[in-house]
Each structure stands twice: as C-alpha cells, then as structure tokens.
Amino acid sequence: MFPEIEKISRRDLLNITLNVLKKYGVKPREKLSQNFIIDPEVIKLILDQVPRDSIILEIGTGIGTLTYYLALKAHKVYTVEIDRKLIRVASDVLRDYKNVEIVQGDALKINWPEVDYLVSNLPYHITSPLIIKMIKYGIPNAVITVQLEVGERLLAKAGSESYGRLSIITQCAYIIERLRKVGPESFYPSPEVSSIILKLRCREEKCIEDLELLEKMTNILFRHRNRSIKWVVSKYFGNEFLNYITSKNFNVNARVRDLDLESIVKLINYCIECEVNLQ
C-alpha cells in the first residue's frame, strides 16, 4: 500500500492520502481533530524512538499510515479509532498485517492492553485526560505529537506562564524529552497551529504514589495560580494547618505558580500528617 519510508516524499504521501480518502468517500472531521500525517521525516523520527519487536498502542488509527510503518517494526500494534468510517479504511489498508489489531472505540472509555509504547498524534480536545489515563495505566514509554501550546505546558517549569496542573501531573510520572517541532504542512488537512513531538519515559519512582491526591491538590492550588500559598491554605485548609506548615519553614509567601513539584508533594504530605481532607 505504502512505499518504503526511505523512498517516499511528502508529496507522494499526500497523494496517497487524498486517493484513499476519495476512494472511500471520507472527509476529515475537524470535530475529531482528524489531521492525517503526510510527512515521511516525522514518521521516520517516530519509528526511530520505538525499539524493534515492541508491543505498541496507537491512539487514532486514521487511514492507517503510521500504523502501517509501525507494523513493519513492531511485534504487535493495537490501534484504536473512534470513527467507524476510518475503521473500514484502515481495515482494508492493513488487511495483510496479522500483527495489527484494530479496535473501534473511544480511547478514554475502553480498556487498554499492556504495552511497551504508546504512539499517538493526540487530539487536542482530549490530550489532558489521555495523559492522565496513560499514567494510571502505567504506560512505560510514549511518543506523542501534540499541539505546540500543549507541549509547552507539558514541558513547563515552575514560574513560567505555561506551568500548571498538566505540567506537574505529567512530570511527576514521566521524564519528558522534546524531539522536534512539526509544522502544519506535515498533516492533511493542515491544522492552524504547529505541533511538537515529545518522548515520555516513565520515572523509576513517581513523585507520589497516589495520583488522586496530586490531582486534588493541584486542582485547589491552580484555581488561584497568582495567589500566595498563605492565602490559598488559609481559605481551604484553615489557619491551624497554615501555622503547621509555617513551623516547617514552608514558604507560605510564595505564589502558587512558583511552587515546584517537590514543594507540592511536600504540601500533600503535610496534609496527610495533619489528616487534612483534600476535597
């Protein structure tokens, strides 16, 4: 179906994509963030991150382009697609590959298999919940393409404008590596914004075992990212707890946006010590 990745150009891949869409009468659906990869250099970069004979979960099969090349290298590819029309296309495109299992369904709702890698061009509108699910399922490695703005949030450090809940929760579980920026021209149809490819490797030890506590604490804190810790703690946990963390030399005058991961975990542990309920 597709030529060798080393011998195909972006124009070739675009033409193949257009022909497949025309053949099956499929129009890309903006609602589902359907932008199909047409850049062989991007595909090669993704393939280079995945060891041979890996077991892979792909979120968003599309017409099966990336799936096809992953199948040539992987031991097994589970690929999830919510759009029934694209399931029909991908089933035909990938019919000769016995190591590919196509699953029709919502990636947020179905059970995931145990895999070595997750690979996906993550739809913008479900990026955050998908990453949370990755963490909860213990996905050890991932290569994801996300909108540049989301990528900056994932990589952001304390004190920066992009720093927030998603930064903290993801960095608690994963070491995140920036691979490369990807322009709109690498997809069809071209999205309005650039993307970025990130590689995520599971930390040997998460910053905290109970992810729910981290979710609850960051939810409280980042409702008021520009307020002081003193103000937030007093409002939600009371003055007695405020006095306790002050006695522990916790910097209560710092702004929420400046709290690094270690400080947030410390605050959670103080809550546990004092039996403070995180709502």
Model-inferred region functions:
Residues M1-I220, R257, E262-Q279:
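Catalytic cores of RNA-modifying enzymes
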Residues S190-V193, L200, D210-F250:
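Long, well-ordered amphipathic alpha-helical subdomains in the mid-to-C-terminal portions
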Residues N253:
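Interdomain hinge/lid region at the active-site interface
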